[in-house]
Amino acid sequence: MRVTIVTMDSHLSAAAARAHRALAKQLPGLELTVHAASEWGDSAAALQACLEDIQRADIVVASMLFMEDHYTPILPALQARRERCDAMVCILSATEVTKLTRLGRFDMQAPQSGAMAFLKNLRGKHKEGEAGGSKATAGERQMKMLRRLPKILKFIPGTAQDVRAYFLCLQYWLSGSDANIGAMVHFLVDRYAAGPRASLKGLAKPPEPREYPEVGLYHPRLRDSAHSGGMTRSLDELPSTATTGARGTVGLLLMRSYLLAGNTAHYDGVITALEARGLRVIPAFAAGLDARPAIEAYFMKDGRSSVDALLSLTGFSLVGGPAYNDTKAAEEVLAQLDVPYFASYPVEFQTLDQWGASDRGLLPVEATMMVAIPELDGSSGAMVFGGRGSAGKVACSGCDHRCTFENTPDSHDMHSCIERADMLASRMGRIVDLRRARRADKRVGLVIFNFPPNAGNTGTAAYLSVFESLHNTMTMLKQQG
């Protein structure tokens, strides 16, 4: 039995490898391969290996393939394999990919079935005049419905059972720990293995999707039997190192999927660096790509901010993700929070040593997703703080440390850049100090137009009274201390 997973989420590779080892005893002869779309841009061999695995896979899972550069190279291979494999599950992807889903009698290319019509009725409609703030809970409502649907569909015979399987796969994936990735593969094999592979059915019962906090907190020193993956829902359970910083408090936003996959070294480095600067750190996460639930739960109290600065390490916009963003919603929550907002990012589509040796630095897709889009929300101070390692022993030339971010082949583990994490912590410390300083102790620099220089252009601007505005601004600053 050959199962191939193709996804943008390179950080799931190590989790899938652990899942494969756990499944080896339950499903003898299982081959599980994972391919990260982020590798194809600079590695023709990686793309070719993916195409070959798709061509011989018995079950194919495709996820997070919404960028044309990611799905276009493999779309013909997926289309060719669709009718020849036991099952194909395509989730959270572009329409061209998603419609290739085929699970038993559930075919997304077939005319709408009774089961799908039933699901549309369950979905409900947005009521006209409904408060705009309700959008903040849209993701929460969708997750509740996702958990509820398999329970409802369980009692409907026929195609509905295959539709139920599709939604169970979504549940497994969205809580993508190694346990859930393994359970998803086990579930698909147990239900859809055909021909000589059918002997694998019924060897062991696949577990139900394991649930994890959808909104919560994380800390690297919170790893014990009571806190799966270092996660908790309670501020009181954070270790003392995270709560005793007298200098000030930084609210940290993390990606839940990295925490579930156990791929957190890049986050751990930043958390440690911030704490070493005497800062209290509250590392929070939310399911999906809407950070508002985490902000409201852990960074605000009685409608007011309880942090001195907000730092996002997700690499995405505050509300939305790589495929879309809701700038207006982000502006609303940031105005309510009213603290400096910074967005830093790991390099996702190249390794750290490739980035360090590059004259260009960020790739165009990284500059767009991780810098430009978050800046539309109001973020500033964009900088790299970590990224993927390399399978080869290549020293990163991005700074004088010349670190070797070595990974085992195909693990795609993340790492923290020592110099960058320390620089980021230093900047956040100074921002917190500035926010907490008395107004009389703050120094403000004003820069006005003067180009080209030495040509009498100082403070010139069409239809603007630059010097009058400057004088009024300075007068108001003095009046306010």
Name each model feature, range by range.
Residues 1-481:
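An N-terminal assembly and electron-transfer interface module characteristic of large anaerobic redox
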